[in-house]
């Protein structure tokens, strides 16, 4: 595959995001809907796919102590700046939160069960009329904007039922046409200057980690760091990763670099690699190449599991990606990288997702531990053999199988998780 296609996909799949991307997506949708209509808000209706609803259900809103779909939608309409994309709530103020709390009776959330992929629709009614926005397939991919039933903007084909994917999704799906040896060849041979931009994710996610080490969230990252000696890059990796996620899910007003639409994915896919780089004094080029490998494997799996799913994509998909990157940084090559992925597939695939919340750092820690274990096993030629569980004869089928466990495998599980969450909130 042409290197430029791969680089273009990597660029498209990584972007800054403030807070967990599902509430950010809801806020962006309502911000855009309000932007086109203006006036005094009478009511807001949000229609979201089950996965997006679940992930935003108990997740903190950046810069506030508030959580959930309703507050995300209200704050998006009240103070959101749609031009900032997934950072649309960057300018939030205390008075905006106070105003939103008085308007909770004006918000209605509806779950759209019969839909494929990510979906969020905002209908904002004011004294000026109705503003409507639809986001599809990617968290910031606005495909329709209406003002009083007049279409102001519409992406071609994105609302056609015969076309299930936006152009961005089609481009990313090309990754699944690659064999693992082609992926590794790209990582080894692409000019460093062409992938140096990947290091932007390190700068951003490291700042978030430093914020988390103040003890935000459940304080897991800070706890792990307290028992980490100077040369232990594994515990250091866990501490960096968990502290960043602690900060993110608790509403810290510091952005993460997302990948495949998730800040937690972006954190897990990068910070363990930074830990190795720092402790082993490796150069930035090696780090960038390992991030490229981590991202590509993550994207590959997510193309089969879906952007949002019943399993914890952060630990499973991003965890498998970073396991390959870890193996690469520790001297592994194609055979060892392949065996690392087999080991990961046989370990934590199937870990459930209960939405973005304070427990995310626990799952992330499990994912990072499994990633290091899988890589170390592979480097010692210890591997789960083909035809054992979901490990297939080809590594490409094995990565596909990881995704298949989530979709269609765990669709009923996802429904039951959501039912439990809704029942528990009453």
From Swiss-Prot:
InterPro entries: Ser_deHydtase-like_asu (IPR005130), UPF0597 (IPR021144). One of its GO terms (biological process) is L-cysteine catabolic process to pyruvate. It holds the Pfam family SDH_alpha. Disulfide bonds: none annotated. It comes from the Bacteria. GO terms for molecular function: L-cysteine desulfhydrase activity. Belongs to the UPF0597 family. PANTHER family: UPF0597 PROTEIN YHAM. This is UPF0597 protein CLI_1810. It comes from Clostridium botulinum (strain Langeland / NCTC 10281 / Type F).
């Amino acid at each position: 595959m042409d290197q430029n296609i791969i680089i273009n996909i990597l660029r498209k799949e990584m972007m800054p995001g403030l807070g967990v991307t599902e509430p950010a997506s809801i806020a962006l949708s309502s911000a855009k809907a309000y932007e086109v209509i203006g006036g005094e808000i009478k009511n807001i209706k949000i229609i979201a796919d089950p996965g997006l609803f679940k992930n935003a259900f108990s997740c903190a809103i950046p810069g506030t102590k508030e959580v959930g779909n309703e507050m995300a939608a209200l704050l998006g309409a009240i103070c959101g700046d749609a031009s900032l994309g997934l950072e649309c709530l960057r300018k939030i103020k205390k008075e905006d939160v106070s105003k939103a709390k008085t308007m909770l009776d004006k918000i209605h959330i509806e779950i759209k069960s019969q839909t494929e992929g990510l979906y969020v629709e905002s209908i904002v009614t004011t004294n000026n009329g109705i503003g409507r926005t639809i986001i599809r397939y990617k968290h910031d991919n606005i495909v329709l904007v209406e003002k009083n039933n007049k279409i102001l903007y519409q992406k071609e084909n994105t609302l056609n039922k015969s076309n299930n994917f936006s152009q961005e999704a089609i481009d990313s799906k090309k990754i699944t046409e690659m064999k693992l040896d082609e992926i590794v060849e790209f990582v080894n041979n692409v000019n460093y200057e062409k992938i140096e931009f990947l290091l932007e994710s390190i700068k951003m996610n490291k700042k978030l980690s430093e914020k988390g080490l103040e003890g935000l969230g459940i304080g897991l990252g800070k706890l792990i760091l307290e028992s980490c000696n100077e040369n232990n890059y594994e515990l250091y990796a866990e501490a960096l990763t968990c502290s960043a996620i602690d900060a993110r899910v608790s509403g810290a007003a510091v952005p993460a670099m997302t990948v495949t639409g998730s800040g937690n994915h972006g954190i897990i896919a990068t910070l363990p690699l930074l830990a190795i780089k720092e402790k082993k004094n490796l150069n930035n080029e090696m780090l960038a190449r390992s991030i490229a490998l981590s991202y590509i494997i993550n994207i590959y799996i997510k193309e089969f599991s879906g952007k949002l799913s019943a399993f914890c994509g952060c630990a499973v998909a991003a965890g498998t990606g970073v396991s390959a990157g870890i193996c690469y940084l520790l001297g592994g090559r194609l055979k060892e990288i392949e065996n690392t992925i087999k080991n990961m597939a046989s370990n934590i695939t199937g870990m459930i997702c209960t939405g973005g919340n304070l427990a995310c750092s626990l799952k992330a820690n499990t994912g990072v531990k499994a990633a290091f274990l899988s890589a170390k096993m592979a480097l010692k030629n210890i591997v789960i053999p083909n035809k054992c569980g979901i490990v297939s004869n080809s590594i490409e089928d094995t990565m596909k199988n990881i995704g298949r466990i989530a979709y269609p495998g765990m669709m009923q599980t996802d429904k039951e998780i959501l039912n439990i969450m809704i029942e528990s909130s009453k």
